[in-house]
Amino acid sequence: MTERPEPDEVITCGQVTLRRYREDDLDALLQAVTESLDHLRPWMPWAANYTRQSAAEFLARSARDWADGSEYNYAIITDGALAGGCSLMARIGPGGLEIGYWVHRACTRRGLATAASAALVEQAFRLPGVDRVEIIHDELNVASGRVPRKLGFTEVGRQPLSEPTPGGNGVGVVWRLTRLQSGSVGRHGIRAG
C-alpha cells in the first residue's frame, strides 16, 4: 500500500515554528483564542462562541482531517508559545489548496502570518497534483490582505463568502499563486523537520 504524500508535521520558518496540532495543545489554544476574541471575532466566524469544548472539537477534527488529507492544521509557535494557527485546506477544487491563518492579538504586525503562509506555500507545492494555492479573506480585513500581497499572490476575483464575517461585508477577495509563480515567494528561512 502506497502512503499518501502529506506536508511536514514540523516546519521552522525564521522566527516561527509550525507544528501539527496535538491533543495537548488544548489549554494553550484555548488561552490564545480567548485572549484574542475581540481581535478574532470580526473576521473568524468560528470565534463567536469559543469554549474549551470548541477547542477540543477542533483538535479532534484536525487529527481526522490530517489523516484523510482534507486539511492540515498547524499551531504557530514563537518564543515557545502558541501564537496562532494556520491551515492548508482542500476546499477550492482539484489541484488547489487554500491557506488560512490567525494570530494572537499580541503577535500582530510581526510577520508571523506572512512567514507561516510562505512555509505553507512551499509545503503545498511539494504535494503531487497541487498547481495553485489561494488565500481568501473579507475585503474589509485589510490586515489579512497584506499577507498574500507580500508573498506575490495575484488577486483573481471577488466572490460572496460562504461564511460571512461579523466585521466584514461578505465579499471575499481571492488571491492565487500558481506553482509557476511560486518562485516569487521569498525563502523566509524555511526548514522542514
Annotate each predicted stretch with a short phrase.
Residues 1-28, 32-39, 73-193:
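Acyl-donor (CoA/ACP) binding surface of acyl/acetyltransferases
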Residues 41-60:
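Conserved GNAT-fold acetyl-CoA-binding loop/helix
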